[in-house]
Amino acid sequence: MKFVQLPDVQASNPDVMVGLTRVGVTEVKKMVEITRSDKRPIILIPTFDIFVDLPSYRKGANLSRNLEAIDRTLEEALNQPVYRIEDLCVDVAKRLLETHEYASNAEVRMHGEYMMKKKSPKTGLECQEVYDIYADAIVVRGGIIRKTIGAKVIAMTACPCAQEISKETAFKKLAALGVADNVIAEFLDDMPMPTHNQRGVGTIKIESGNDVKVSIEAIIDIIENSMSSQMYELLKREDERYVVHSAHKNPKFVEDCVRTMAKNLVRKFPSLPDDAVITIEQVNEESIHRHNAFAERMATFGELKKEMLSNGPVL
């Protein structure tokens, strides 16, 4: 049987000779097993976006064969132990450059859900909490590698402004009833006044070179502990009382959350290289407004560390 050699249209010249930054596929789902030395492995089903650049002289990237190559690349990478999701992205990007000789760089993005076990604060009930995690890798032919790891966490915030108004009102009311000022102050210190709450959404992303190792669980911990209170999937009444009381004892503006995350990040990762790029973002979903509150800080780690140290010790 004689086979007809079909033309490779994608390898021809395009009508408009313009290079493309990214060509590839998105929403590719794969199962990933994260190996842990002292614990059971974690199973993720993340979504990948996978790209290579396309030179101006090439019409297309042979997407049908490209997808086949990407799928094979992922399968080969996933057959090996995976310890960090960002390193998996780096490995896939390297393999893509081996497959696509015309590309000068490859990029792999990943997002998924990460499950962690957690206990309620007072009764110790165990439950599973879900966190959004992110990883990204860019590999340039010739050896330049940049990778990103990050997480998004939902927790609780309490508004300081409305609380101060409630506190002032309570003080005047109790004083009018004849309660001594020192007794009022002691009461208000122990029983924080009501305020409106927000569901806070905090995000930290750390971009660095290939030799840097950052724990995703440490990032999650930083975000959770930078708001007024953590959230829990399962709470009994004693837990609920504790969470509400704790949040109102620790009121925070959206700006406070970002600044606290920055401080905790510098404290947790003091050995990060100065050229690591840090993105910290907080969105507070308002309960008494139709809008949301937003704050962000982007800086190199060196810039952030210098600014933090100018305020005094952070360790």
From Swiss-Prot:
GO molecular function term, any single one: GTP cyclohydrolase IV activity
GO biological process entries: tetrahydromethanopterin biosynthetic process
Binding note for cofactor: Binds 1 Fe(2+) ion per subunit.
PANTHER family to which the protein is assigned, alphabetical: GTP CYCLOHYDROLASE MPTA
A Pfam family hit: GCHY-1
Similarity section: Belongs to the GTP cyclohydrolase IV family.
Keywords: Hydrolase, Iron, Metal-binding
Residues of the site described as May be catalytically important: 159
Protein's recorded name: GTP cyclohydrolase MptA 1
